[in-house]
Amino acid sequence: VAIAINKDVDILFVIDNSGSMAEEQALLSKNFAAFISVLEDPEVLANYRIGITTTDSGNPRCPSAQYTPEGGNLVLSSCLDRVDQGEFTFNSDDFSKTCTDFCTKRNADLTVRGTATGVDPNEVPRKWIERIEKVSNINGVADNTEAFQCYGPQGVAGCGFESHLESMYLALAGAASPKSKNNYGFLRDAAILSIVVITDEVDCSYNPATKEIFTTNKVFWNDPAVDTAPTSSLCWFAGVECTGGPGTYSECHSQNWDKDRKVTTDPAAAVLQPVSKYIDFVKSIEEKKQEIDENQRVLISLITGVPVGYDTFDKEIPYEDRPADDEEQINFGIGPGCILGDVNAPTATARPPVREREFAEAFLDDPKTERNLYSICQDSYAAALESIATKIRDQIVPACMPSCVRDKDRSTPVLDPNCRLIETNIKGEEKDIPQCTEVNGAWTAGNGANVCFATLIDKTGKETLSKIDNISDYCNMEGFNLEFVLVRSAPAAAGTTISANCELSDNRTLDCPNL
């Protein structure tokens, strides 16, 4: 029987590093403990990786000769070192406090411990944060919250024509490409994948074949007759269509426009990359994961320009124009989706998402009953981050044996199972997994093995002397009488699957009365 024994979680953060994102990045650092604490809860103990990239994948208006856009590359560098490089300066304003309020460690103070991946058995430093079997790969910090507070802030010197979706695409594509030095091996075949985007503007993932819309073709510019350069309003006009209005719109949706501002059904002619490109790509990743665990879902979350309360259905996204001569209308093509502070003198505003909203909603079972967008216009992201992490936690389902297992010795109150766990590699070669032993209250592999399995058999928590062999509430409620735990000291090779071969009960009424 195929078994999904999985506490592995791969989390990609796509962080807007444009000039308006200083306070938002600071809040992310300030509240990140709310995220990590869920994953590291003793009842969860996720084996997680956290990769970080930015929304900057380059643009004709942001000359690559002057800087190097991340382009989806995972980055792992202390923000203190990047303060010195000017990455926290925008329009001559110093936003270094975004980093220095929470980070005290430079790269020289931080050591990235070498780790193996499913595609590379060599233990070398990777461009991500990870914690596997309660051991972090970052030395020099108290915990991974502190690590993220140094590695997470991405500065404010990035391109203002943000490409959230393309950056995400490049990051995930790179994870499967040996050509990507930073990203290759980041994704694990069976791991839960969570993608988190933090941004205050709309997606502007452009088609390189029509890049002239940023330079010589002014059809999407705010005022083609007057403007000498486009504003971010181009991203709205080139990727969105609304009904109703002008003024207040009843709804807005993504639209594929060609270079003449006509609707096109040809993806290659669309001036912004069609949203379907990104949905189909991530769906293909999800489908491969579902070959291992049919219940696994890719999780998408955005902290973006929606009102506080949108995630709980208490508010809806406003799509409203500002007056034509209003600075926000000129700069963005649409009014704010959310406002922080006084409406007449807001501390911050953010644009209402459309393309990225549609992408995120494509990974919900029913957008009418659940939402995965949280407001960026608030003083704390703790609740949003906790909610995002909780959705990850809820995907980490205990590995119940999905059949009733025979008790070899019914003279004792606990199950005495006869089981083998088998690891099968991508070539179809099988290997028996040894059983763990309990050492000082922890499951441990012996004889140099890098993987072992344990059987959890105590239904009440009082049937054995061990404190770590209790069956989870989940498996108990499902009526199963056996649960597995897999302990690894090194990652499984890509394509590895796990199956269980147990002697099954010939008396389910006795062995599994609740099944």
Language-model segments: residues:
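Divalent cation-coordinating acidic motifs and surrounding scaffolds
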Residues: 1-515
